[in-house]
From Swiss-Prot:
Catalytic activity: RNA(n) + a ribonucleoside 5'-triphosphate = RNA(n+1) + diphosphate
GO aspect biological process, one term: DNA-templated transcription
Gene: rpoA
Stored HAMAP family: RNApol_bact_RpoA
UniProt GO cellular component terms: cytoplasm; DNA-directed RNA polymerase complex
Naturally occurring in which organism (per UniProt): Chlamydia trachomatis serovar L2 (strain ATCC VR-902B / DSM 19102 / 434/Bu)
Protein's name according to its UniProt entry: DNA-directed RNA polymerase subunit alpha
Keyword flag Transcription: yes
Length: 377
């Protein structure tokens, strides 16, 4: 880590106070499966930077369990039929691929990533068949007789039995990311008749994002990021975005360790932490009441900026657009405001002040303060 004396001071970045989450109208499954996230304001360009990174992390980075193999009484290979079962083994495999599992939070195998074998005994007798109209459906919920995993879709049909029988079924479940074809799945102690499946581990179905223009005060040169996330129910969209953010942070931390100069960001002053009356007394001061050079005072006067309130609400880029207003004047003004515990680009919305009404509001507050002093006198 570099010595703090070599730190670089950067202007503050506009950042959202929070990320807003909302349901997507008409989406199946509600907010537990589909949600929209809005983050604004962001500096220009950061919308696409964050949106693209989050999208990739959501699609390829999240882990979830999936069935990677199975075996069943009477099944020797994938290309066969089983007497008394409507579906052939190929269709049973397809149905197993549609199984959605999530793990109970407090149950874990050693190391957390090992595969686990789940065994179930399926017994179908004549009364079961009669009650089901001659065809007894065996669902994912029927196969999860051990309490390690929970089925998101327990009513999902795996196969259909047409005669009395007893079957032993073994499902092997593993954790992974993204999608893995069966050829890439390596199993320890694979059984002779154990059939390996392609596995869709990713719980994220779809991620879309777009970037809109938004404003801070009267400045419209900022981004609004809108991110829409759809999952299959194994994780909620809110969890998925939180996990993806942690994954990205983990990877960025590798580059942060480089022994280079550190950036210190100027932060916006929170008027909630300051006494509002004290701040108002500073805001209504005239520019000529603080010690600025003649050049800086004239620049502000030519820009029709008469009070500190009119000054601090201005974003720095806006000031630099004024005629004859250069870096030297900017530096002087920023230092003076820093002494007053103020800064450029302040959010004065708590006082009902914006760029469109700041001049009128400063006059109104100045009159209010004078009236208050006269009353006390």
């Amino acid at each position: 880590m570099s010595d703090s004396s070599h730190n670089l001071l950067y202007n503050k970045f506009e950042l959202p106070e929070s990320v807003k989450m909302s349901p997507v109208e008409g989406a199946v499954g509600g907010i537990d499966k589909v949600a929209r996230f809005v983050a604004d304001p962001l500096e220009k360009g950061m919308g696409h930077t964050l949106g693209s990174a989050l999208r990739r992390a959501l699609l390829i980075g999240l882990e979830a369990p999936a069935i990677v193999s199975f075996s069943m009484t009477g099944v020797l290979h994938e290309y066969m039929a089983v007497e008394g079962i409507i579906e052939d083994v190929t269709n049973i495999v397809l149905n197993l691929k549609g199984s959605l599992l999530k793990k109970y939070p407090l149950q874990d195998c050693e190391g957390g990533r090992c595969s686990q074998k789940l065994r179930a005994t399926i017994s179908v007798d004549a009364s079961d068949l009669a009650a089901a109209g001659g065809q007894k459906e065996v669902t994912l919920g029927d196969l999860l007789q051990e309490g390690t995993f929970e089925a998101v879709n327990p009513e999902h049909v795996i196969f259909t039995v047409t005669r009395p029988m007893q079957l032993e079924v073994m499902l092997r479940v593993a954790f992974g990311r993204g999608y893995s074809p069966s050829e890439r799945i390596v199993l320890e102690e694979r059984g002779m008749n154990e059939i390996v499946l392609d596995a869709a581990f990713s719980p994220v179905v779809l991620v879309n994002y777009f970037v809109e223009d938004t404003r801070v005060g009267q400045d419209t040169d900022f981004d609004r990021l809108v991110l829409q996330v759809e999952t299959d129910g194994r994780v909620a969209p809110k969890e998925a975005v939180a996990f993806a953010t942690q994954i990205l942070s983990k990877h960025f931390s590798v580059f942060e360790k480089m022994d280079e100069k550190r950036i210190v960001f100027e932060e916006a002053i929170s008027v909630e932490k300051e006494n509002k009356d004290d701040i108002l007394h500073k805001l209504v001061l005239g520019i000529n009441e603080i010690e600025l050079s003649v050049r800086s005072t004239n620049c502000l006067s030519n820009a029709n900026i008469e009070t500190i309130g009119e000054l601090v609400i201005m974003p720095e880029p806006r000031l630099l657009q004024f005629r004859n207003f250069g870096k030297k004047s900017l530096c002087e003004i920023k230092n003076k405001l820093k002494e007053m515990k103020l800064e450029l680009g302040m959010d004065l919305s708590q006082f009902g002040v914006g760029l469109d009404n700041v001049k009128e509001k400063m006059k109104w507050y100045a009159e209010k303060i004078r009236s208050s002093k006269n009353t006390k006198g």
